[in-house]
């Protein structure tokens, strides 16, 4: 490892010789300065300085003045302030000046070493620790994985995998990343078997303790919050994966405390017209078709499939005996989000305000269709990064800040996630087969039954049955459906895109977050 060069500025340098020798013995080169002006000259002349130890109380330029000038010369240069003063305003000024650390005299050499390691070696040490810790956890997760896990155990496994993915994002050395990807793929293989074995049983009352699903979410989780709140906002961010929630969580936590973080399971297909309509209606698709034929549209029907979400919600609330004043808004672009954020005061008179945010879903589709977005979100870390960038500059964050100031409780959830698809599964169908790449429904489907979850009788899964011989098939793991005609072109176009509609951890295990204002 290369030696780091440290500039130490202090007007009592003679007294610090033992400390300098100690640093030399630990592998640091130390350049000294006895004033702020001398320190600035050295910074100007020597681009090889890696960090500065800066005394706060020096004759001439003070430490704080020197700090400001160093940052003008080299904003990236870490400065560790050393001072006798414990006055709070000096600490505040130093922190405001973007110091890397703050040490109170008298300092012992080990304190300085610790501060330098924290400042200069943080990323390397964190990276090494991340890889070491994941190696330990790898075996534990591997032993846990099987299709015999309970729903709650699958939630724990998925949380661990996402945790390590986000830790690997921060690590410089990604030596264990390929191992993590393989373990996630194995988890998805087992999760597919779990869903295949249990999904229909959950819906048909054959499991005494089924997980909360799209159509039971509001009744099981949200209505109790609504009952005890004067005013509450339900924010449904379409297509928000659990990992995407975890990266925007720290930003939200500046304004809100996470009261409860839960994961629920999306119904199949994990597509907006099915999952989000189920969420708002409290009904499965075949039940919506039967009870509300004027609002429900099947895959073959023309027109928008999510045009009656507010109607579905009103009907569910009525069934549950909840007569509340509510608003419903759907945001599909920046201008719409900005306009809604500006009207928060008008919404405060409602007990319930529902906001559907479509951006993340649009990003997923744009990632497929637009070359520039494909390059910006080439893989999952990049996809998370672009989500974070959107959120930090979105009207949604502005709205959340306003709601926090008004002390309003909010719930953030989603309808389904999305998965990064890589491998094609061949399927044949007639001209009426739907276009989704992760599920197909039709009367003349030809496929390899080992590569899909097939629902031969849609009624078993409470899905619409458009023809006597209709069936549904769902893609597993990271697969996507492709037709034999023009197969190679189709595969090249859709491989490495983000799709939803099928069965994977990322699509089905999704966040439901209750937040209270700070």
Language-model segments: residues:
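Two-component/phosphorelay signaling modules centered on CheY-like receiver
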Residues: 13-31
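Feature captures the catalytic ectodomains and active-site-proximal regions of enzymes
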Residues: 11-12, 21-22, 57, 92, ...
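Short amphipathic alpha-helix used as the core "switch/output" element in two-component signaling
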Residues: 41, 64-75
């Amino acid at each position: 490892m290369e030696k780091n060069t440290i500039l130490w500025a202090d007007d009592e340098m003679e007294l610090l010789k033992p400390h300098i020798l100690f640093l030399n013995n630990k592998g640091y080169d130390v350049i000294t300065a006895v004033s702020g002006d001398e320190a600035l000259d050295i910074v100007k002349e020597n681009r090889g300085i890696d960090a500065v130890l800066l005394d706060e109380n020096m004759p001439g330029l003070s430490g704080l003045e020197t700090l400001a000038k160093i940052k003008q010369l080299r904003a990236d240069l870490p400065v560790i302030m050393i001072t006798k003063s414990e006055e709070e305003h000096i600490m505040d000024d130093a922190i405001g000046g973007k110091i890397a650390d703050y040490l109170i005299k008298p300092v012992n050499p080990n304190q300085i070493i610790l501060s330098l390691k924290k400042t200069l070696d943080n990323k390397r040490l964190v990276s090494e620790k991340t890889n070491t810790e994941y190696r330990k956890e790898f075996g534990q997760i591997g032993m846990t994985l099987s299709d015999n896990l309970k729903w709650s155990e699958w939630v724990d496994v998925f949380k661990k995998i996402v945790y390590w993915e986000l830790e690997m994002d921060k690590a410089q050395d990604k030596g264990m990343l390929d191992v993590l990807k393989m373990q996630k793929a194995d988890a998805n293989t087992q999760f597919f078997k779990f869903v295949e074995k249990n999904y229909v049983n959950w819906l048909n009352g054959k499991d005494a303790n089924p997980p909360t699903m799209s159509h039971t979410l509001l009744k099981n989780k949200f209505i109790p919050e609504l009952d005890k709140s004067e005013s509450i906002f339900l924010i449904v961010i379409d297509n928000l994966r659990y990992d995407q929630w975890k990266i925007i969580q720290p930003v939200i936590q500046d304004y809100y405390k996470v009261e409860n973080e839960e994961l629920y399971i999306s119904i199949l297909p994990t597509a907006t017209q099915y999952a989000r309509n189920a969420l708002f209606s409290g009904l499965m698709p075949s039940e919506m078709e039967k009870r509300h034929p004027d609002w429900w549209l099947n895959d073959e029907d023309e027109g928008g499939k999510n045009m009656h979400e507010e109607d579905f919600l009103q009907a569910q609330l009525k069934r549950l005996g909840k007569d509340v004043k509510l608003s419903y808004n759907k945001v599909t672009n920046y201008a719409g989000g900005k306009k809604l954020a500006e009207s928060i005061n008008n919404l405060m008179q409602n007990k319930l305000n529902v906001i559907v945010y479509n951006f993340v879903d649009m990003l997923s589709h744009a990632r497929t269709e637009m070359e520039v977005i494909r390059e910006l979100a080439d893989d999952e870390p990049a996809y998370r990064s672009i989500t974070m960038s959107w959120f930090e500059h979105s009207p949604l964050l502005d709205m959340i800040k306003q709601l926090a100031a008004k002390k309003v409780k909010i719930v953030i959830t989603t309808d389904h996630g999305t998965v990064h698809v890589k491998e094609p599964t061949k399927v044949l169908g007639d001209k009426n087969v739907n276009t989704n790449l992760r599920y197909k429904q039709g009367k003349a489907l030809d496929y390899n039954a080992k590569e899909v979850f097939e629902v031969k009788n849609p009624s078993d899964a409470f899905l619409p049955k458009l023809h006597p011989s209709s069936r549904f098939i769902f893609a597993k793991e990271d697969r996507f459906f492709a037709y034999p005609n023009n197969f190679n072109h189709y595969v090249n176009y859709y491989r490495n895109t983000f799709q939803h509609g099928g069965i994977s951890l990322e699509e089905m295990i999704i966040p439901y977050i209750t937040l209270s204002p700070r």
